[in-house]
Design a protein with these regions (language model features):
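Compositionally biased intrinsically disordered regions enriched in Thr/Gly
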Residues: 18-290
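Positively charged n-region of N-terminal signal peptides that target proteins for export
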Residues: 1-4
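Hydrophobic core
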Residues: 12-13, 17
Length: 290
């Protein structure tokens, strides 16, 4: 994750579900003072912001893993007036198998999501005292939803989109984080797993993303330093059916008003750089272009 935000709040969040869901979901009730025991898109063009009055249907279930596994949505709705926070998160949970690596993945997802709101639930005493004096009715807010970019027998790739706003801040903040998992080996994937050891793949990714984003209507103001060929600039990525998508948070490559951005590099463009292992993982997933 490119950034970790401790006190952030928003009154809106947006997401896009690959096949059908560009939606938020209805909230029925909140927990009160005591939080639940949870551990807890990128779009081209940028995601339009939605208000809670626009919230519609939940994300549909996804069946994968040869029909054996199912992704269902779990929700956490946490609110405390005394601690001045309002948290709404949704994340995927795998059902249909009890294998240790599936259970580890479920825990990993829950913990990753819960890490995002731990700081909001546990404000410093001096900060809370200040909030109560200056903004007694205000709430820190965090909204998180997810996009599944690929779910096959061998790969699960998930993008989490977060909108947050901190008490006293002038505007909300968008940021994203990802999980890319090899269901065959039972391990989380790193970007380097797909490329030849000596291949200068970061230089290629940097150049490709820079060229694509430079054609944007705000290309003149592209933050090129954030596209330099270093791994930290490309640590938010997902596998899709047709390529590897690189996600850039709001304000990372353009001004904040342009929203979050993403660039997908087709597998055909990457093929000469891919390692034997990378090719094997991708071909087992029946992706297009290899």
């Amino acid at each position: 994750m490119k950034r970790f935000i401790t006190y952030v709040v928003t009154s809106l969040f947006a997401f896009n579900f690959g096949v059908s869901a560009s939606a938020l979901w209805p909230w029925s009730s909140y927990s009160t003072e005591k939080p639940a025991s949870l551990p807890a898109v990128p779009l081209i063009p940028a995601t339009p912001a939605l208000t809670e009055s626009n919230i519609t249907a939940p994300v549909p279930q996804i069946v994968f893993g040869g029909g054996r596994l199912k992704l269902v949505s779990e929700e956490a709705q946490l609110k405390s007036q005394s601690l001045q926070y309002d948290i709404k998160v949704r994340y995927p949970h795998i059902v249909g198998a009890n294998e240790p690596h599936i259970q580890r993945l479920n825990r990993r997802i829950e913990e990753l999501v819960s890490e995002q709101y731990y700081g909001i639930q546990h404000p410093l005493k001096e900060d809370l005292r200040y909030y109560r004096q200056r903004w007694p009715e205000a709430l820190s807010e965090l909204f998180i939803d997810y996009v599944v970019t690929l779910a096959t027998d061998s790969i699960l790739s998930i993008y989490f989109n977060a909108y947050s706003y901190g008490i006293g801040a002038g505007t909300s903040v968008q940021y994203g984080f990802t999980v890319n998992y090899d269901l065959v080996s039972g391990k989380e994937l790193k970007l380097s797993d797909f490329f030849q050891h000596r291949a200068n793949y970061l230089a290629f990714i940097s150049r490709y993303c820079t060229d694509q984003l430079a054609t944007h209507k705000s290309g003149e103001w592209l933050h090129r330093e954030n596209l330099a060929p270093v791994i930290s600039n490309f640590d938010s990525w997902n596998i899709t059916r047709t390529g590897i998508r690189f996600n850039f948070d709001e304000g990372e490559v353009f001004g904040c008003s342009e929203g979050e951005q993403a660039v997908e590099i087709p597998f055909a463009e990457l093929k000469s750089l891919l390692s034997a292992r990378g090719l094997s993982i991708l071909r087992n997933s029946s992706v297009v272009g290899l």
